[in-house]
Amino acid sequence: MNKKYFNLKIIYISFLLISSISFNFYYGYLGVFPIDSFLIYNAGYNVLNGFHPFKDYWSITGPLLDYIQFIFFLLFDVNWFSYVLHAAIINFIITIFSFYFFIKMGLNISFSFIYSLCISILAYPLIGTPFVDIHAVIFSLISVSLMNLGIFYKKNNFFYYSAILIILSFFSKQIPSAYILLSQILILLFYIYACNKKNYKPLINYLMIIFLSFIFILVFFFINDIPIKNFIVQYILYPASIGSERTLELSFTFNKIIGQFKFIYLSLLPILGVILILLKKKIKNIEITRDLIILISTIIVSLIFIYCQMITRNQILIFFLIPYYLAISQIYTTKYWNRKSVLPIILILLLVSTAKYHQRFNNEKKFMDLDGYDINLVLNSKVIDSTLSGLKWISLDFIDEPDKEIKLIKNTKEFLLNDIENKIYITDYQFFQSITKNDNISPNKWYDALSIPSEKNKYFANYKLFFLESLKKQQIDNIYFISLERKEEIFINSVIDNKKCLNFEKINKILTKFIFKNCKI
C-alpha cells in the first residue's frame, strides 16, 4: 500500500466517522415517536437495575439491544446522549464495514467512499435512536457480506464471523435473520458442491459457531436465572404465531410489492443483468461460478429483506440497501458488462434515491409520522428532565402543540413523584421509570397491541400468569396508564378476572390511576 493511497484511506475513514456519527446525532435529537423512540431506553435502564428480559419483563423482541444499551448507560450514565450514541455507533459500523467490503470486492476506493457515505445518511438517521429492526437488518447485511467475502477469497475465517453476526441479528429481532440463516446454509452447500471440491469445512465452521453461540446463551440464561421456557414462549412461539397471521393478511397490491420498493428493485436490475450474462456463458470456470453464487445470494437476501419489511408493518427502513446494491452493481457490471452508459445510470440512481429518502425520512421525519411538522415549534426536553437535555421535542399526537404535551408530562411526573406506594407504569413514554427513579418494573417491555397475546391466542394463558405473578411479587398498589390512547382494555381488563376490585381515577388528559391493591391474585 503506497503512502498516497494510505493517506487517502485515512481521510475517507475520518470523514465517514464524522458523517455517520453527526448525521445520526442531529436526527436522533429531533422529534420523537414515543412507542418506538423510548422502547430501548427503558429496557436498558431495567437491565442497569438488575432486571432481565424474559425473566422480569415480557419481551418479544430485541434482548440484545437491552444489554447493549445497558453498557452505554453504565459508561455514559442514563441520558439521551448515551442513548443516541448507541445508534450512532451502529450507524458508523455499517458505514465503515461497507467501505471495507466494497474495497475488498474490488471497487475503487473513491467510489467505495461515495456509496458508504450514502449508507451513513440513509441507515440509522431516519430514527436516530436504537431500533430493533434496524439493528437486525444491519447485522444481517454484514453477515451476508462476510459470507460473500468467504466465498470470494475462499477463507474460512469469514464464515466464522458471518455466523456470529447472524446470531447478533437474531437476538436483535427474529427476522430477517431466521430466513437468512436458512438461505446461508443452502448457499454454502451449493458453494461447497460447485467451487470447493466438496470440502464441507466452511459449513461445519459456520454451524459450529451457531451451536456454540446458543450454548453461550444458555449459560448466560442459567447464570441469570432466566427460564428457558419463558424465552421459547416469548421470543419464538408467540412471535411465530403473529408472523403466520401477518403473512396470511398480506396485501399483494402493486404498491405494496413494487411501488414502495421501486428504487431497491432498480438498484438490483444491473445485478440481474450480470446474472443473465454469466448464465449464458458456455464455459463457466470457478471464478464465474463463484461470482454467480454471490450475485444470486444477493438477490435472494434482498427479497428476504423486502418480505420481512412487508410483514413488520413499520414505515420502510431498508432504503439504505439501495447504495449497497448499487455498489455491488458497479463492481460486477464493470467486470462483466463494461458499457459506458451503465455507470452514469447507477450514479444517477444513487444520487436521486439518497436525496429523495434523506429529505423524506430524515428531514421530514416520515418514519415517525411527523410529515408536515413545523421545526420552529420544537422544544428542548430539558424542561421535562435534565437527562433528556437537548432532545428537540415534537410528537404526532401534539404535532401543533408540543408545549401542551410537555406541560402534561411535567404534571404527570410531579404526580408520580408524590406517590410513594408500589407502582408500575403502562406507557409509551418509557422514560418515566428513570426520571421518577421507580424501583418497580412493568411486566411488559413494550405497549404495542401485538406485544402481548390476545385472549384468543393460545399463549395468552402464559402471558396472564407472567403478568399477575409480577404484580404479586412486587406487591403493586397502583397501575398508571400514561397515554392519550386507552390501553387498559388490552393491558389490564384482559388479565384481571374480577374487574370490580379496580378503582380508577383520571388525573389529567394523559394520566389515569388504577388502584390495584384491593385486588386478590
Regions found by a protein language model. Give the residues of each.
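Hydrophobic, aromatic-rich transmembrane alpha-helices
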Residues: L17, K262-D291, L326-Y332
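Extracytoplasmic catalytic/substrate-binding loops of multi-pass membrane glycan-assembly enzymes
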Residues: G28-A43, F54-I71, V78-F81, I226-I228
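Transmembrane-helix signature of polytopic, membrane-embedded enzymes
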Residues: I96-Y124, K154-N157
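Membrane-interface transmembrane helices that cradle and orient dolichyl/undecaprenyl
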Residues: K104-G106, L141-Y161, S169, C195-K197, ...
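Membrane-interface alpha helices of multi-pass inner-membrane proteins
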Residues: F158-P176, I180-I185, I299-M310
